[in-house]
A protein has these predicted regions:
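Substrate-binding groove of N-acetylhexosamine-processing glycoside hydrolases
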Residues: 1-254
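Glycan-association/targeting regions that enable binding to alpha-glucans and other polysaccharides
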Residues: 236-375
């Protein structure tokens, strides 16, 4: 008998004594590889140390991720406020968008009127965790900290967005029906909803910026897609249609989502490969998040050389996979893939230079090579 647990539920896996109900093994299932690193780490350690507590697991994880100096405090914060069922859940699975059953729908956590108070007290730990940032100096540790910081900020922003959406819908519900009132009365009622719509757009922008700051794997790209496909059509699309119908004119620019990126500029690789086949070219995909991404001048460069060597870097200008999308490709040729290689990405922007990984060029990303695996 095998006990199968989703790793999203295994922060306190030591509570689940599978043997008590006849299970003789434990299998972890996950679908967000990087994002469930704490659970994977804890699950791997527990069989060797059954006295391991949740606090212990977080302490060990954060010591490796962001350094010994802040690991204890970070572990205390997460163990008390973000551990398993302690973590607030601002989204839900399906039930909102017609015909869609899946994750990523923002959950309404407000009372359903214009006098709501967002339940933010459960997110006090977000600022407590963020305050640790000033104590981190290592570029690599700081980069990893920022990813986890963005993840918890996403949850808080989702709660705010859910409340702002609820307030807007409460106002829209008060607009007289078309067959029961004059056009002027409907327009006047709709205009009273514009401040709520603007507030929703602003809070949604903050959510998207935090979500994009958390992207580091294909799994987090899936989180972006979930919101875009399951929540935004109703929250932003339908409410826009309803308001414009009542107003008799398009919404003002402030009530529309921004068309330019407003978040923290980033350059990164999605789930970078650690191993490649000897003598076979390696394609590298870089993602640039910047308001300058539409500019031909904002083009990343791939720098590579044999691992551990002091020879000059081979510089390869990356080319866009699709115009204006911020996804760039470059290839390390087969001739260079005879042994382990190291590489990093850089991009010159107005006023700043972005690099990936954050420790580059001193500590670039490494790819080992091996003979092809026979299948």
């Amino acid at each position: 008998s095998i006990c199968v647990l989703s790793l999203s539920l295994t922060q306190k896996y030591h509570r689940f004594r599978a043997v008590e109900y006849g299970a003789t093994g434990l299998m972890g299932i996950h679908w967000r590889t990087a994002e469930v690193a704490p659970q994977v780490s804890g699950l791997a350690k527990f069989p060797w140390n059954h006295s391991l507590t949740s606090l212990d697991a977080w302490r060990l994880f954060f010591a490796a991720e962001i350094g010994e100096g802040v690991a204890e405090r970070a572990a205390q914060i997460f163990s008390a406020h973000a551990d398993s069922y302690e973590m607030p859940r601002p989204d839900t699975w399906g039930g909102g968008s017609p015909g869609i059953d899946g994750p990523g729908e923002i959950r309404d956590q407000c009372p359903g009127n214009s006098s709501w108070e967002p339940p933010l007290s459960r997110y006090d730990f977000v600022e407590q965790f963020h305050a640790l940032r000033t104590q981190i100096t290592d570029p690599g540790a700081l980069s990893r900290f920022d990813l986890w910081d963005a993840h918890v900020r996403v949850a808080r922003h989702q709660t705010l967005v859910g409340c702002d959406w609820n307030t807007l819908e409460w106002c829209i519900d008060g607009i007289p029906a078309e067959n029961a009132s004059s056009a002027a009365a409907r327009a006047a009622a709709a205009k009273k909803c514009l401040p709520s719509r603007v507030k929703l757009v602003n809070s949604t922008t903050l959510l998207v910026n935090a979500l994009l700051a958390s992207v580091g794997s294909a799994g987090t790209i899936g989180s972006v897609q979930n919101l875009m496909q399951h929540t935004f059509p109703l929250m932003l699309g339908l409410t826009q249609t309803q308001l414009e119908s009542a107003l008799g004119e398009p919404l003002p620019p402030a009530a529309l989502p921004p068309t330019k990126f407003r978040g923290v500029e980033r350059l990164f690789v999605i789930t970078a490969r650690l191993r490649a086949e000897k003598g076979r070219s390696l394609q590298v995909k870089g993602v640039l998040l910047s308001q300058h991404v539409v500019s031909s001048a904002a083009t990343p460069t791939l720098h590579h050389r044999p691992m551990g060597s002091s020879v000059a870097w081979t510089n390869v200008t990356m080319h866009p996979k699709m115009a204006g999308r911020g996804v760039f490709l470059a290839t390390i040729g087969a001739a260079a893939m005879q042994g382990a290689v190291e590489y990093y990405l850089s991009c010159e922007l107005p006023g700043s230079t972005l690099v990936w990984p954050a420790t580059a060029p001193a500590v670039p990303h490494t790819v080992v090579v091996a003979a092809a695996i026979e299948r």
